[in-house]
């Protein structure tokens, strides 16, 4: 036993070998894992470093670029995001001649450089100034090593490249410059039948099922690339009435933009929209300038783009271009694209421009078109403009005819025509405000034309014929009657009751918004005294006799009659509609009538002061008369006694019932007296063979009586044995006292 040597822990060997072998194997595994991770990290860093020079022709990279291009977002002004610059081919190809472009790429930039450094360096050189500088960044915010410099014109870019010999020194490092040209790419194709964009791999339209070959045959080759290649600036032929100003400073205000554009165009604050960030409340770098027409916008754009030096606002060079709409473009049969929104705005702008031109330029205004026929891609719009030329000429002729001086109260005429280019339909408000102005001036001007005489002559209103919605802004106030005269229909309008009076038929009418017509009011409510003065176009003697009457008396009579009319007709109108109209039509009528009567309500608020001034003396006299008629000594009126006489004395209230206290159940001892045999547990045990009085278990060895806690025996002192008188913990104080008294009595015996 003494010769046996105990084996140490280090020398043990068993099923899994010695401990040294296991430690060595673990160290080798950890070192190999560490080496693999370091190699993987080094490979990732190397790939990121040379990410810009990868093979961009591989199918995997092509799919990734397509995915990024689809997911890339565009800003509100249509300017390209950073992902869209991947469409440019910035690979080095020494075997191909570079194609000149107005976009120049700076390659090999330091990582810590930013856009401001590049912009300051480029602007410090003499010669053409750039329109925009864009530094490409990663998601982490670091530079990718290249940037794009955009010029207004191709000549400026080529001259700048020749002046700097295609090299630029930034932070002591020579940077190579190259022309950036977009590579031909295959995009999503547009169906010419339904106008839906389809994925480029889809052979049939997703909506209508038209074949892709049909769209390719109708659209000439290269039509899909034409808009995309010129997406940056106005070389694509896109025309709009709005201009975008880029490279706006973060703290530039609207007044600075107005002062900078003041030498070239006259603008107001409402013509400029400065886009700001919602969080920082600073400018986002661009603003929009809205001009009356596309012609003025193109002229201003041409002036600003040819400025040398370029336009600067708060020390920043401003880039100018047409503002593009965010709507989908439409493809014409000849392959050119144009926005549907610009078509509608084109016709409206042309109509407004032609109506506001002076008489000597009427010929030019009639021939004006928003998109000229000679421009490329706008041949169809020339035909559209010819369809609307008769409408423009009629508008211009109306302006020429209305040469009579207008009254001070007549509103300024405004063209509110709307044109839809899908079908050459014209929508015009009947009864322009210019007629009202000429009718007013006809009474004072000795020589008046036939058109003004027709405007002043009221036309007979035919019930059931649809008319245009009444425009209260064109009504003229008649001092003799105190009402407003409608020169279009020849009716007199009362803003208080919103009823019309026809002087030809001596009939009262009201406007029905659902039927779009004037309906006669009910008869038999006293129309004779409600006829306004000057309404009947009779002889001059009758007019003079009516004018000689006191105005206050006439106005007072008319006010009383119209109030009486309003009350009776409103009741009849409500009863008639409620009895014959279904529930569904009532809801629609409420909406339409609310829209139709909105102008009347606003007009009534505006003209309320005129009626108050006119009827104020009469109302004061009426109030004085009513006060005089009141009894001098007003006695106290016991309304409670009158109520008792009329309805009798009410019965006294019933006496309140006495409240009975509910029986109190001692919730602490619910089973003190035991439970009966009707409970579920007892029934289940009896079903299994248990009988009352026997214990539980296989051999009925369980207890039959409930377990009760015994109270500690109380002793009188040391060594003295106490007594137990059978008091339980569940006993009350009275029961315990009774048991104690009984135990003492038994011990004494």
Swiss-Prot record:
Compartments reported by the entry: Nucleus
Residue intervals of the G-patch domain: 677-723
UniProt xrefs under PROSITE patterns: G_PATCH, RRM, ZF_RANBP2_1, ZF_RANBP2_2
One GO process term, biological-process aspect: mRNA splicing, via spliceosome
Main subcellular localisation: nucleus
Region annotated Disordered, chain positions: 1-88, 425-471, 520-558, 570-595, 626-680
Annotated keywords: Metal-binding, mRNA processing, mRNA splicing, Nucleus, Repeat, RNA-binding, Spliceosome, Zinc, Zinc-finger
ZnF bounds (RanBP2-type): 185-214
GO molecular function, one term: mRNA binding
Gene Ontology CC terms, in alphabetical order: nucleus; spliceosomal complex
Residue ranges constituting the RRM domain according to the UniProt record: 102-182, 241-325
SMART domains: G_patch, RRM, ZnF_RBZ
Low complexity: bias regions: 429-460
Gene3D superfamilies: 3.30.70.330, Zinc finger, RanBP2-type
PANTHER family: RNA-BINDING PROTEIN, RNA-BINDING PROTEIN 5
Family (UniProt): Belongs to the RBM5/RBM10 family.
Function summary: Component of the spliceosome A complex. Regulates alternative splicing of a number of mRNAs. May modulate splice site pairing after recruitment of the U1 and U2 snRNPs to the 5' and 3' splice sites of the intron.
Binding partners and assembly: Component of the spliceosome A complex (also known as the prespliceosome). Appears to dissociate from the spliceosome upon formation of the spliceosome B complex (also known as the precatalytic spliceosome), in which the heterotrimeric U4/U6.U5 snRNPs are bound.
Name under which the protein is recorded: RNA-binding protein 5-B
Organism: Xenopus laevis (African clawed frog)
């Amino acid at each position: 036993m003494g010769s046996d040597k105990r084996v140490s822990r280090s020398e043990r060997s068993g099923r899994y070998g010695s401990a040294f072998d296991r430690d060595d194997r673990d160290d080798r595994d950890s070192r190999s894992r560490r080496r693999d991770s370091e190699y993987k990290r080094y490979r990732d860093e190397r790939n990121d470093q040379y990410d810009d020079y990868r093979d961009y022709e591989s199918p995997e990279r092509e799919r990734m670029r397509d995915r990024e291009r689809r997911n890339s977002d565009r800003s509100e002004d249509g300017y390209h995001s950073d992902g869209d610059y991947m469409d440019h081919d910035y690979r080095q190809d020494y075997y191909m001649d570079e194609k000149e472009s107005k976009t120049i790429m700076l390659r090999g930039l330091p990582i810590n450089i930013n856009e401001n450094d590049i912009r300051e360096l480029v602007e410090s050189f003499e010669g053409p100034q750039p329109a925009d500088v864009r530094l490409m960044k990663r998601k982490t915010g670091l530079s990718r090593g290249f940037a794009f410099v955009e010029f207004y014109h191709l000549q400026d870019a080529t001259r700048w490249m020749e002046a700097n010999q295609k090299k630029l020194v930034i932070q002591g490092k020579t940077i190579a410059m190259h022309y950036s040209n977009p590579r031909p790419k295959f995009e999503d194709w547009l169906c010419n039948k339904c106008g839906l964009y389809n994925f480029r791999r889809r052979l049939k339209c997703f909506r209508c099922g038209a074949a892709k070959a049909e769209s390719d045959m109708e659209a000439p080759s290269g039509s899909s690339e034409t808009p995309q290649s010129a997406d940056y600036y106005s070389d694509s032929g896109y025309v709009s009435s709005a201009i975008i100003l880029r490279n706006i400073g973060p703290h530039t205000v609207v007044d600075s933009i107005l002062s900078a554009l003041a030498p070239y165009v006259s603008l107001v604050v409402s013509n400029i929209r400065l886009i700001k960030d919602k969080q920082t409340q600073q400018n986002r770098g661009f603003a929009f300038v809205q001009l009356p027409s596309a012609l003025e916008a193109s002229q201003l754009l041409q002036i600003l783009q040819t400025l040398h030096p370029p336009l600067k606002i708060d020390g920043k060079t401003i880039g100018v271009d047409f503002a593009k709409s965010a709507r989908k473009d439409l493809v014409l049969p000849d392959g050119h694209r144009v926005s549907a929104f610009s078509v509608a705005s084109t016709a409206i702008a042309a109509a407004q421009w032609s109506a506001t031109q002076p008489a000597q330029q009427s010929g030019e205004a009639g021939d004006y078109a928003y998109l000229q026929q000679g421009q490329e891609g706008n041949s169809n719009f020339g035909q559209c403009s010819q369809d609307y030329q008769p409408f423009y000429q009629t508008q211009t002729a109306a302006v020429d005819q209305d040469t009579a001086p207008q009254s001070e109260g007549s509103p300024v005429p405004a063209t509110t025509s709307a044109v839809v280019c899908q079908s050459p339909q014209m929508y015009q408000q009947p009864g322009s405000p210019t007629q009202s102005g000429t009718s007013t001036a006809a009474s004072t001007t000795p020589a008046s034309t036939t058109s003004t005489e027709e405007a002043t002559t009221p036309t007979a209103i035919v019930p059931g014929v649809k008319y245009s919605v009444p425009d209260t802004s064109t009504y003229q106030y008649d001092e003799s009657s105190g009402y407003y005269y409608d020169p279009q229909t020849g009716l007199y309008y009362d803003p208080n009751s919103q009823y019309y009076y026809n002087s030809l038929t001596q009939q009262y009418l009201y406007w029905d918004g659902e039927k779009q017509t004037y309906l006669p009011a009910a008869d038999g409510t006293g129309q004779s005294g409600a006829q306004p003065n000057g309404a009947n176009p009779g002889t001059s003697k009758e007019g003079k006799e009516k004018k000689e009457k006191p105005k206050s008396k006439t106005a007072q009579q008319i006010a009383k009659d119209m109030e009486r009319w309003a009350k009776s007709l409103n009741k009849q109108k409500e009863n008639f509609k409620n009895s014959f109209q279904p529930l569904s039509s009532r809801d629609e009528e409420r909406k339409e009538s609310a829209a139709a009567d909105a102008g009347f309500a606003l007009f009534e608020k505006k003209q309320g002061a005129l009626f108050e001034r006119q009827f104020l003396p009469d109302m004061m006299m009426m109030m004085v008369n009513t006060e005089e008629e009141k009894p001098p000594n007003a006695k106290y009126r016991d309304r409670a006694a009158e109520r008792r006489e009329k309805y009798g004395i009410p019965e006294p209230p019933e006496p309140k019932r006495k409240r009975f206290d509910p029986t109190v159940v001692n919730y602490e001892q619910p089973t003190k007296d035991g439970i009966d045999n009707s409970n579920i547990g007892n029934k289940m045990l009896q079903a299994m063979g248990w009988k009352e009085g026997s214990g539980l278990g296989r051999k009925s060895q369980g207890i039959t009586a409930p377990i009760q806690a015994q109270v500690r025996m109380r002793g009188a002192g040391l060594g003295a044995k106490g007594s137990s008188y059978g008091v339980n913990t569940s006993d009350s104080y009275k029961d315990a006292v009774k048991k104690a008294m009984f135990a003492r009595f038994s011990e004494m015996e």
